[in-house]
């Protein structure tokens, strides 16, 4: 027990060799709101020349709190006062009473990583992990000294961020959004706007009708579920896409990108370590990160690389059964289709098999379908909702209880509007009660950004034939699509032509996930540098060519195999040639 | 134990009176991707006329999953098959093995509210609660039949959503955002754009410079911490606002509104029931909702109504000590200044006293300062950051460890851009390590909406004297400000002139939180209707006048007292007169 009163001296432990000088205390008196001489419960006794000099230095030290404290301690020892560090812990959450008088106190310690929610510490998100962070450092270095590296720019192939790589936004979208932001333009004479050649008539009309749906301003909160008129557009889009299988606006939630939808769904179903969520390996690490935050279990099911990263339903069922045996409830099953990072697109049969397992075990399915507009020739996308409805028709009673949440986003496709945060989820088989719970969660974040909601409307209702923007819009889409295909195929063929790297043929999405078969010497050097072999390859690739990718470990892979994920969004084919040269040199250097 | 094989019949319990007919199973074979005749592991045996007729009815029933199942069961009993309901639970998480052959299975039950994360079920957010939901119903009713109610429109005084109530956005902001959305406009000849009288020159220039900061497109993901150039603007704004106390861009995080910042901060520090977060009562219910989601404890500290809802530091310290005694760690202290719902603005002394407690106990302070631009004449806003720096200067060593997160938003002030989701937090006293943890959390959501980030830049760097938009921008701001003041004062004076309702004088924010002293008869009727008295008053108010408010219980209040929160955003003064009439009639009806 310690007691302190004004002017007492005491020794707490041997490590404190200085005597603590007490502070004079003045009671707080009310005062005018004049700054900066406020009276507070205490004042310092020191006003030495050293302190005055020190105060000038302080702003620089304030940058890092720990430096600041070190500097303060230094100052205190300069002035003969003892370090308070050793005492601080006493005041933190004292189990004993520090009897204070006149409001003197010892400042408690800061909160540190030790105080942070462990779930947050555990969560990892590699897409913006170590290699991309290194790329940022190199980018900054190039800005200072453009000649200092063997390349002149960083190519961010680590993230599906098309417009960062000079992909142009679709003109129609941006005309509409521009008009929504500045409705004064809509008060102008339509013909004058059209004659200015800045806005097309159909864009003007769409902006006006959207403005009505929205209620008059993109600056007002909308309903938390999203603007009703836009949800109707989404439902119509889904119905048409799914060959007439009806979708209802009540089942649609507009969200700030698909990531927000994942967040809601996992918040709702994750109850802690006894909850299991099946995720494909390799996966998009949003899922494992969110599971870590929710302190729930990831149940990985491996995709089969050799058959184009296909999904194996027996694998899924095995994982489910094992979870049950381990008393973990396999509550949710995540399917990413088209796959990220794999680029695989599921056949109707695969989807049906997945639903069998879901129906049998009562597992909610999350269908992450954000890449459904990124499909390569020769492949057809079938939505999981459509297949579910077919199964329900064909096999009455078997699939009626299946609960499915299907996600889409304006970040991908050919629009690539990642920074606008538009998306939606469609809930199938969720009761009104369950939807109300999700609505409540959504209401705590108030509403998704309204311009993002508008963008969803544009995505699901693009210009149609006969409308003024149709032809140019089609031309823009085709151009982007063709370039993506060309780059994807070039990269794919390049990988397969080189030794030590092979790749499954992409069917969709924006990524390749090649397997790297590193020579033993390279693996040794990686270990020496305390990197995994895939990190090592990615690091070398970055430092030689400026191409930033993400090691396969960020997505999960069969133990003993090494991959990396790259996008094929960067314009041109030059960077692919650079990669090819680098790879050959790398293997020349490390070949056994 | 049950075993099933093809064509077996069995009875499970007395309640199953029908015999289960087995299904023929066909092994899945690969097939062309032709729809809809996919082969699946099993097929139904039924294809009766009744079923075909039923299928036409099905789309309507699909709307509600439970109706769908009922319909299916009905169909099955029509065709002589027994209900599968009673068997479903067996397959859910079977502890025994259901030996199946040929992939037949019984569908498991759906997940229901019983399976939902309890924390989500517990969370409440009253701002969009029962009374506002009733208002939405009445709104829909008015759309169908405008004469059916004693009022012609709903006035949403329940939410701080200015642009929903015809407050116009600031022209300068919207010109810049419009240009950012459609950069083609920036490629035009500047003079021509100006001559069109649609865009002012300073808006064009700002859009160009922001576009450079952003990196070329609002459609690309930005860095997760937010565009660097915009963070610099924020740091400069804070430094200037705080009389030269330096703010650093590294300490700034741009966020999707202040709500996202609260979400990050509480995720990081909430570790479960042993974590306590002090919140003011009354509070903005985002805090209690988020605490419920994080399964941590709210530690309420009561604001003092009779002294204008001031903060009592002794009350705060008492709450802290009690928490410690109950083995709850008082980790975070939330201060809402200006207050929501109270409208109170803290004096420098009050702030200093709050920091004393924080410094003494090592509690992180969240300063929710989103209403700092909504200050009434005669009141001055002092940021908590500024006061902290003063305390650190005046009392070296005492306050060095204090950790503070200060929040701001583009949703309030005179811009009222709620739907655009712009905001920031400034971290003071957080080490680099701690900032990295927050950065990681932010990266899981990728980035805040980029146009919202741009709006933050506009908020902290409005047009200045000499620039083309300055005068009109000032005029717009003053006009909005004056109208807000007029309505606030009118409402305040009206409340205080009536019996049974009294109100503290607002110093800032967008709300009044009057206390209602209901007559006993009214309290009785409320209880009869199973409503709290404040809900009852709000419901009556809504149904008589269309004015939608939020009962005080949504924000917290001293037990035995009743309040409601209303905004003063609705245009004009007519609705205030309506309220006055309603209140007099209400008291005439219920007076003892």
From Swiss-Prot, chains A, B:
According to its UniProt record, the EC number is: 2.6.1.2
Q: In the UniProt record, which is one GO cellular component term?
A: mitochondrion
Describe what upregulates or represses it: Induced by alanine.
| Residues found modified as N6-(pyridoxal phosphate)lysine | 412
Transit peptide: first to last position:
1-64
> At which positions is pyridoxal 5'-phosphate bound?
258-259, 284, 340, 409, 421
Q: Give the location in the cell.
A: Mitochondrion matrix
Top-level taxonomic group:
Eukaryota
* Signal peptide limits: none
GO BP of this protein: alanine biosynthetic process; alanine catabolic process; L-alanine catabolic process
Q: Which InterPro entries match?
A: ALAT1/2-like, Aminotransferase_I/II_large, PyrdxlP-dep_Trfase, PyrdxlP-dep_Trfase_major, PyrdxlP-dep_Trfase_small
Q: What GO molecular function annotation could you give as one example from this UniProt entry? A: pyridoxal phosphate binding
Cofactor section: pyridoxal 5'-phosphate
* Pathway membership: Amino-acid degradation; L-alanine degradation via transaminase pathway; pyruvate from L-alanine: step 1/1
As its record notes, the protein acts as a catalyst of: L-alanine + 2-oxoglutarate = pyruvate + L-glutamate
Which residues in this protein are found as Phosphoserine? 77
Q: Which PANTHER family match?
A: ALANINE AMINOTRANSFERASE, ALANINE TRANSAMINASE
| Described purpose of this protein according to its UniProt entry | Alanine aminotransferase involved in both alanine biosynthesis and utilization. Under respiratory conditions, constitutes the sole pathway for alanine biosynthesis and catabolism. Under fermentative conditions, it plays a catabolic role and alanine is mainly synthesized through an alternative pathway.
Q: Record's family?
A: Belongs to the class-I pyridoxal-phosphate-dependent aminotransferase family. Alanine aminotransferase subfamily.
Subunit text? Homodimer.
Instruction: Tell me more from the record.
Output: Present with 9960 molecules/cell in log phase SD medium.
Protein name per UniProt:
Alanine aminotransferase, mitochondrial
Which species does the entry assign this protein to? Saccharomyces cerevisiae (strain ATCC 204508 / S288c) (Baker's yeast)
Q: Which gene encodes it?
A: ALT1
